Amino acid sequence: MYSDRRHTRKRQRLLVVGVFLVLLLLALAGVLFALSNSSDSAKKETDNASNKEAKADKKDSSGNSGGEPGKKNNGAKKSESDKSGSNVKLGDKPEAVKGIYMSAYTVGGNLDAYLDFTDSTEINAMVIDVKDVTGEVMYPSEVPLANEIGATREVLPDLKTLTKQLDDRGVYSIARIAVFEDDILPRERPDLAPTDSSTGEPWLNDAGQAWSDGYNKKVWEYNVAIAKEAAEAGFDEVQFDYIRFPSDGPLDTLEYKKTPFPNDQTALGEFLKYADKELEPTGARIAADVFGLAATEDGAGVGQYMNKLAPHLDVVNPMTYPSHYPIGSFGYDNPNAQPYEMVRESMKDFEEDTEKVNPDIEIRPWIQDFDLGDPPYGPAEIQAQMQAVYDSNETGWLLWNPSNVYTEGALKPADSNEPTTAEETTTQ
């Protein structure tokens, strides 16, 4: 009996020791697992940091630091906190976007020369026609309606190839899409166009150009589908032009089939709201071209009210060409002779109009690099407009010349370290 109890106690002690050893081994295994995860996590963080640095180096071919607004600067991103409530796009972009307009035909035939131009000057962005006011879609789009109406062309190379070319050279890519002025869609699909009440045919402006119906959601879907193709192909930004209602022509005979919104500005705002939602997954920024007087004259008569448009935009592009302002604008008899004043006064109004509805919006104006009226425009007039932008606490601008011939003498060289902010410069 005593021997049995002794063997029982021995077995109990062995069991306790065995359990202790098992627990000890499990604890050691847990420590080793934690150390392994910590090492892997640290390695991933190091690899991610290295990848980000490599990407930044690729985008910043000029070698400038992140805070310098020089050429090809990767720059700061917009705040992740968008006070307007819409999603902010977080793709790489230069600290200061300084771009030129490029027709699809120029890109299709002479892109390399313009890429060299960006290498030698402060230009770091291109605005490229993807769909223009003729209604032509400048690449072989897969959007069904574009093919149904015969709008597609093969002017541009494959969009993915094009955006890779631009990205490899550190050029920020912007796809320009003319929305409601469109000479193909209304003629092929009159049900998607306003009607001329005197003829029963699609309404035409003074230039004989047709317009699509800005109230019609099928028209919205068509243009946004093209925008999505461009964004998914790699364009950094989508710029909607002719995001307005007609301004010239026999407006008294202009009739819409349905007007499901209380006014034109609400329709435009709802279009941009829809575009913002559809494009959000692509990460592309959304921009819109507007009249230079849109903020000064409450929509400029075409529905471009900033309180409706700005909440759904990352960028607004006022077309502040001094030659386009009517006599007497801001008190000047010859606006074309006041390049600084026209841009500066317009920028003030846009800042005031957007502050309450989207204080984070970038105001990046189109400025004039062409001759129309007196005086002709050279480096001094172009630089005066740029200075007006800097004095408005903005850093980016876009040069417009319909022939894509730009005044190199107005531009800084690519390696220039000259200041371009209001705090560091003086007004001309």
Regions found by a protein language model. Give the residues of each.
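Aromatic-lined carbohydrate-binding/catalytic grooves of carbohydrate-active enzymes
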Residues: 121-155, 247
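N-terminal Lys/Arg-rich, disordered targeting/topogenic segments
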Residues: 1-14
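Catalytic domains of carbohydrate-active enzymes, especially glycoside hydrolases
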Residues: 110-137, 231-238, 312-315, 389-397
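Aromatic-lined carbohydrate-recognition surfaces of secreted/lumenal glycan-active proteins
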Residues: 172-178, 182, 239, 262-302, ...
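Glycine-rich, aromatic-flanked loop segments that form ligand/cofactor-binding clefts
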Residues: 125-127, 157-202, 239
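Aromatic- and acidic-residue-enriched segments that line the glycan-binding/catalytic groove
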Residues: 138-149, 182-204, 248-259
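Substrate-binding cleft of secreted/luminal carbohydrate-active enzymes
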Residues: 36-37, 313-327, 336-344, 349-428
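Active-site-adjacent "subsite" loops/lids of carbohydrate-active enzymes
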Residues: 90-102, 180-229
